[in-house]
């Protein structure tokens, strides 16, 4: 069975993971974290009184991992459906991993809001995609449905958050589970 890496570009934990790991031996699977929460009844800690502590913990992990400081987008967390649909467009063009890595750098190393079209455009350009074509494709009903279907399939497999690495029946969730600190 192929190893699968489930992700959403709005997650700083995904940023921590892809910034330090090659992940070139896995199938990248874009899903909607918000969609997972809707299915499971969960929600983001970033919208609770744990926000500041959670952000500080992520910043400390980035420093511990030797990564550049996190630059939080002003509107984080936001609505990343457009960015996640753009991931599906990138997959159709064979540049999903490159697009996702660029989007995550734009969001968490440059502090740009991935819920805004211009940030997605920059990720598309850096990945060799035509941003106008990407913008047109992300509005397609079949692409919207595909993201819903991929998210449902991930949920059915037991995925409850991102990042998650599925290796056969084994699910590793979180940057620290996928590559435990030594």
Predicted features, each with a name:
Residues 9-107:
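Structural alpha/beta surface segment adjacent to cysteine/selenocysteine redox centers
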Residues 3-24, 105-182:
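C-terminal cap of thioredoxin/glutaredoxin-like
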